[in-house]
Amino acid sequence: MSFPAFDGRRIGMLTPSSNTVLEPYTSAMLAPFGDEASAHFGRFRVVEISMSGASQAQFTLEPILEAAERLAEANPHVIAWNGTSAAWLGLDKDRALCAAITERTGVPATSTMLAYDEIFRAEGIRRLGLVTPYIDDIQTRIAANYAAQGIEIVAEARLEDKGNYSFATYPPEQVAAMVTEVAQARPDAIAVVCTNFRGAPVAARLEAETGIPVLDSVAITAAHCLRVAGLDPARVTGWGSVFQRVARLTPVPTT
């Protein structure tokens, strides 16, 4: 008796080395798919988030591409940079990175911040609430980059932490309190920008309480990757409306 080869959809994610949040959360988000979808991770060194030269050097191209090459050996259907550095370094940084990943590996590539950009454009978001664990220098740069895209940060909350490992130590309820504070300005949406920050478990509850979309970085990356891989993100529930929002962007492929 012969059996067809098993071939679920494999999602590759490039992960900051000191991140301890995105891997377990992403795996939990993919649970409704069972063996239809699996997440696979490759790490490169990221230990601090600041505007220092040493911090910015963590995001130079070659170490990330080397990690992508190793990840590509698992034959993923998509590779995502699951990190938010383009929020302060600029979207062109991620566009160039994703193009380089695809050129090097032959695998479609995307990123957290490109996923945000797509949903913001599709939903016409112009007034944004921003929640991060970052320091003021980073937050200011993020706001300036969004202003250049026609998006105003109408309220923000931050923790003045250079991280990166420490970002994961803040409990979900602390993130929830920050989101609740920012929601008072009634933005079009609230972005929890950091993939090592625990916004995803409280997003659905906060949306119900505030009536405002709460778009967590880990969740939006997972949703975007599912769509690129040909699966329906709307099957994921309990992590906020971002999965249903991403599912509406384009028809889900049937093959």
List each model region and its residues.
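Glycine/small-residue-rich loop that forms an oxyanion/phosphate-binding "nest" at active or ligand-binding sites
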Residues: 68-110
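Hydrophobic alpha-helical
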Residues: 176-209, 221-222
